[in-house]
Amino acid sequence: MAKAQSYFGTSRGLGLHASRRGLLRAGLAIGSLALGRRAALGQPGGMHAHMPEPGVVQMPLVPVTDQPLVEPEIRRSINGVLSTSLRCAYAYRDIGGTRLYLRSYEGGLAPTLRMKPGETLKIRLTNDLPPNRDIVPGNPSYPHQLNNTNLHFHGAHCSPSGIADNVMRSMVPGNSYDIEIALPEDHTSGTYWYHPHHHGSADVQVASGMVGAIIVEGDFADVPEIARARDRVMLLTQIVFDAFYMVEDFGTLFPETATRFLAINGQRRPVIDMRPGEVQRWRLVGSQYQNNMLLELDQHRLNLIACDGIQLGAMQETTQLLIAPGQRARSEEHTSELQSQ
């Protein structure tokens, strides 16, 4: 997967107006894909072979937009170790006004993991997805056994073997295993992410929302304005589902007849409130499974400051950001000291 960018936005030319309470609302405007309301039923032989139960409650597609941004839970390292657990299981999620039944980490929006260079990440990964009902095809490169899983620390400079960041490991439903990833002392600080990387099931699981951010702290520590800024994590995803409001077949991910839209942290076009003079650091994670995303702030400008932890020599001002799957972006947003109306 490709890697991403970071942005630093200022209010020079943002065209924002302060409210009576002195709050500035910065709306994240991501164009949605209106590709039809009926979802694809998938391919013969694979349709809902991994469903845990029938009778999922269906709800009409009623877009819900312009709600305050919801951010993931934060889990931090202690004394050089970030020790946590992640559970893979189906869960109901209300996304963009539609109730979906999807594979997930921790039953919804996956936690953000924060650690420092030289520290160790320890995860007990539990697979509580239902048993697979299909067999391995003659060509194992075809999608199969969609409830097998593993975990990948995307972008980390670490060991790919043993119980570290080993994408060749496979965990069948009903099992658990330990992951231990040690970062070197000189590891690049910045925004990373984690996701399944099991060949045959990764796309379906990522499309279901099994993605989370990892922050390796210390980036821009020598720039006080950035170091003091409030961090906000934004996971960019493509929401797609079939007629059962699920993702149960590889074919659901690609046909133009599938219902799909874009989301940030499981929300359609969320809104961020900023006080006059406030600075925020936005960490954007391109965790979509397929398409590039064109991101912009409504009437705002953005300034690129780093690419996947690699700091640029100077800010690069822009109005739009194209993020490919796997890319990450840090974004600093400024608001000026405007007078209340």
Q: Residue locations for each model-derived region?
A:
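Histidine-centered copper-binding motifs that mark active-site loops
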Residues: 43-334
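Residue-level detector of conserved catalytic or cofactor/ligand-binding positions
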Residues: 333-341
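Cleavable N-terminal signal peptides
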Residues: 29, 39-40
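N-terminal secretory signal peptides
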Residues: 1-19, 26-33
